[in-house]
Amino acid sequence: WIQRHNELTALTAAGVSRTRVITPIVAAAIAISLSTCLGRELIIPQLAKKLDRDPKNLGGEAGQELKPRFDNETGILMQGVYTFANEQRIQQPSFVLPETLDQYGKQLGAESAYYRPPEGDRPGGYLFKKVLRPSQLTEKPSLKLDGRAVVMTPHDAPWLQSDECFVISNINFDQLTGGRSWRQFSSTAQLIAGLSNPSLGLAGEYGADVRVAIHARVVQPLLDLTLLFLGLPLVLSGANRNVFVAIGLCGIVCTAFMMVVLGCQYLGEISLLEPALAAWAPLMIFVPVAVGLFDRIEY
C-alpha cells in the first residue's frame, strides 16, 4: 500500500532506508511468532482435554466410542465399549491378554475400568471394578511379565476390593482415547516424553511422525521469518505498484512454500526422509532464495 501511494518514495527521499522501513514489520512478525509458540507450549496443553472433546459434549458426560489401542510394553490390546472423560472411565472394558499373561484366560473383562495416575509406589493404570472375566481371577495371584506385576489382584494387593483388579499401563486416559489428537495438543516436552514411553511404541520408524512434529515446532519461527522475507521484496520492490498483483504473487509464493513444507514433513512421517531433515529441508531451500530477494529492497 505504501508502494502504491508513493509513500515509500517519500521515505527513501528523506534518507530512510528500506531496511529501516521494514524493521517494525519484522519485529511484529517475530513477536507474533514467539507468542504463537508460547501459546502452543503453555496454554494449549492446559486446554487439551476441552479442545479434544465434541462441542456437544464439553463436560465429558456422554460416552465416546473407544477405538482399540495396543500397549506395546505389555502386549495388551485395550478395548471397551464407551469412554467417559469426566470420570476417566471405560464402560465394559475387554482387554485382550498376550500369551505371556493368559494363564487364567485370554480376555480380561469387567463392568467398568477407571484410569488411575501413578501415586506413591503404585504405578499408573486401569482399575477394573466388578471383574467378569476370567472367572475367579480375584482369588488368584497377580499376573507378571518378566518378574514385574502387570495385572494385580487382591491376592497380592490388599488395597484392592474382592471384585477388583488393576492393570498397569503407561498409556494414560488421554492417550488411550485421543488417538493422534494428543500429539496435536501436547507440548513439545510431552511429545519428547512420549517417545521414551515404551507403551506407546514410538521407538524407531513408528514414531517418525512425532519426531517430525518435534523438529517442525523448533523450526517453525524460522519458517515464519523466511516466508516474510520471501514476500517483502514482492511488495516493496519498484516493479509492482499494483496492490492486487503483489497480493497474487504473495499468494503464489505462500502456496509454493507451504506445499514444500508439508511435502517434506509427509516424506519424514513415512520415513523416506530423516525427521530432522524433513523439518529443516524447507529452510535449506528457501533461505538462500530469501537472501537473494532481500538484496532487491536493501538500498
Regions found by a protein language model. Name each.
Residues A27-D146:
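Non-transmembrane, extracytosolic/lumenal segments of membrane-associated proteins
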Residues V287-Y299:
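A juxtamembrane structural motif centered on a specific transmembrane helix
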Residues R4, I43, L230-G231, V260-G263:
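Hydrophobic/aromatic residues in alpha-helical transmembrane segments
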Residues T12-S17, S271:
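Short helix-to-coil transition segments within interhelical loops
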Residues K49-R69, Y115-I252, G268-L273, E298-Y299:
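Non-cytosolic (extracellular/periplasmic/ER-lumenal) segments of integral membrane proteins
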Residues A276-V289:
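Small-residue-rich transmembrane alpha-helices that serve as helix-helix interface/gating elements
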Residues W1-T9, A14:
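Transmembrane helix boundary and interhelical loop/hinge segments in multi-pass membrane proteins
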